[in-house]
A protein has these predicted regions:
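Conserved catalytic core of the tyrosine transesterase superfamily
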Residues: 4-169
Length: 169
């Protein structure tokens, strides 16, 4: 794998996890959707709804590195953020392959999909103390009941919450 592909793949995974975006939203990101000065990313969600998500420090670093590598390898600095080897917009199938290959390379035995990263982002935000309504906005859900489906509370988190908040713990 060349440096360009390695940087792209790392950034694809980071965008999926850091923003909790859907794979279709990832594929639709254009360079103009990124504001590195203000550190936010504009996503085009279901039903043509747009939402703004923050760019965290790790994603910021990976985006800068990827954009630098991308611009070095490509004469065409076209709009789509993620491009295939044939310089077309990266598609869903390619993203699934990137996730599967990366999981295999790091010896993850369970079945991993791009949506797994979305679920993980939501769960980790909740475990970190974020309220459900904020996670709903972050994920671009119109209903909080949809957000509840996406989240899993770990046994450890539940035990800790019980111990810290229940008077008879």
């Amino acid at each position: 794998m060349c440096i360009r592909d390695s940087s792209r793949n790392r950034t694809v995974i980071d965008v999926l996890y850091s923003t909790g975006c859907r794979v279709s939203e990832l594929c639709d990101i254009n360079i103009s959707d990124i504001d590195l000065d203000e550190k936010y990313l504009k996503l085009k969600g279901k039903g043509s709804k747009q939402r703004i998500v923050p760019i965290g420090s790790m994603l910021y670093k990976n985006l800068l590195q990827y954009l630098n590598v991308r611009d070095t390898f490509l004469q065409n600095r076209g709009e789509p953020l993620f491009l295939s080897k044939s310089k077309n917009k990266l598609d869903r199938t390619a993203v699934f392959r990137i996730i599967k290959k990366t999981a295999k390379n790091i010896s993850i035995q369970t079945d991993v999909h791009p949506h797994t990263l979305r679920h993980s982002a939501a769960t980790h935000m909740l475990e970190g103390g974020c309220d459900l309504r904020t996670v709903q906005e972050f994920l671009g859900h119109s209903s909080v009941s949809t957000t509840q489906i996406y989240t899993k509370v770990t046994k450890e988190f539940l035990e800790e919450a019980f111990t810290e908040s229940h008077p008879r713990s």
